[in-house]
């Protein structure tokens, strides 16, 4: 690699909105994210309101068409 053309990497702290912090190497000093693997519904297994809405739609369909 050529000397002097690559950005300087440093230890960086990534901070999530849920309070989780991660240390990685990056060219930026601090990084803030809204959602991470610690609080994302896909990784935590919680579906929240989306599942309730889908259930009520299915119930309305069954009530309307008698199935």
Swiss-Prot record:
Cofactor note text: Binds 1 zinc ion per subunit.
Regions annotated as coiled coil: none
Pfam families reported for this sequence: Ribosomal_L31
A GO term, aspect molecular function: rRNA binding
Binding-site residues, Zn(2+): 16, 18, 36, 39
Needed cofactors: Zn(2+)
Any single GO CC term annotated in Swiss-Prot or TrEMBL for this entry: ribonucleoprotein complex
Keyword Zinc annotated: yes
Record Gene3D superfamilies: Ribosomal protein L31
TM annotation in the entry: none
GO terms for biological process, alphabetical: translation
Recorded superkingdom: Bacteria
Keyword list, A-Z: Metal-binding, Ribonucleoprotein, Ribosomal protein, RNA-binding, rRNA-binding, Zinc
Keyword match DNA-binding: no
Subunit-structure text: Part of the 50S ribosomal subunit.
Family from the record: Belongs to the bacterial ribosomal protein bL31 family. Type A subfamily.
Job description of the protein: Binds the 23S rRNA.
Name the record gives this protein: Large ribosomal subunit protein bL31
Organism listed in the record: Symbiobacterium thermophilum (strain DSM 24528 / JCM 14929 / IAM 14863 / T)
Gene: rpmE
């Amino acid at each position: 690699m050529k000397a002097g053309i690559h950005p300087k990497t440093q230890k960086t702290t990534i901070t999530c909105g849920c309070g989780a912090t991660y240390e990685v190497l990056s060219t930026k000093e601090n990084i803030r994210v809204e959602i991470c693997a610690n609080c994302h519904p896909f990784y935590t297994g919680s579906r929240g309101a989306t599942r309730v809405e889908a259930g009520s739609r299915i119930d309305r369909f069954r009530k309307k068409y008698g199935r």
